[in-house]
């Protein structure tokens, strides 16, 4: 292998090794179990359109732009986040809300188990 070819190969290997690792696919969610898990979310959130509490209504949240529920005063960080609540983004956010959106008003440490997140997301998708 020539010096030029080995340099190109080394660069390609470095670029590949430096590429970001993408989040693993979510497990299949169980909306019935998700409803049970959602009990902890109901302390601050409702699933009734327009009924905000300490947190915004989560009615129809999947596929919506972040900070778009009418009548709720979002943090500047959430308003500027540019997020759309797809399943993968919801999972990242529910893992560690304050890490995903530094400055969010959501005072929740996060949900560490992928299956729990998938179940809650499946439940939200049905509401």
Please annotate each region the language model reported.
Residues 68-91:
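Short Fe-S-cluster ligation motifs
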Residues 21-38:
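Electrostatic cytochrome c docking/interface patches
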Residues 45-51, 63:
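Detector for the c-type heme attachment site
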Residues 33-36, 53, 57, 73, ...:
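Extracytoplasmic/secreted proteins, especially bacterial periplasmic and envelope-associated proteins
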Residues 34, 39-47, 120:
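The canonical Cys-X-X-Cys-His
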Residues 84-127:
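C-terminal capping alpha-helices of c-type cytochrome domains
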Residues 1-4:
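N-terminal secretory signal peptides that target proteins for export/translocation
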């Amino acid at each position: 292998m020539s010096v030029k070819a080995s340099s190109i190969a080394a660069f390609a290997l470095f670029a590949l090794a430096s590429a970001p690792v993408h989040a693993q696919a979510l497990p299949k969610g169980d909306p019935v179990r998700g409803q049970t898990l959602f009990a902890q979310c109901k302390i601050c959130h409702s699933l009734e359109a327009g009924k905000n509490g300490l947190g915004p209504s989560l009615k129809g949240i999947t596929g919506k732009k972040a900070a778009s529920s009418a009548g709720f005063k979002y943090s500047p960080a959430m308003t500027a986040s540019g997020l759309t609540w797809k399943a993968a983004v919801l999972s990242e956010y529910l893992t560690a809300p304050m890490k995903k959106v530094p400055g969010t008003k959501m005072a929740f440490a996060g949900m560490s188990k992928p299956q729990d997140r998938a179940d809650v997301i499946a439940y939200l998708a049905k509401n």
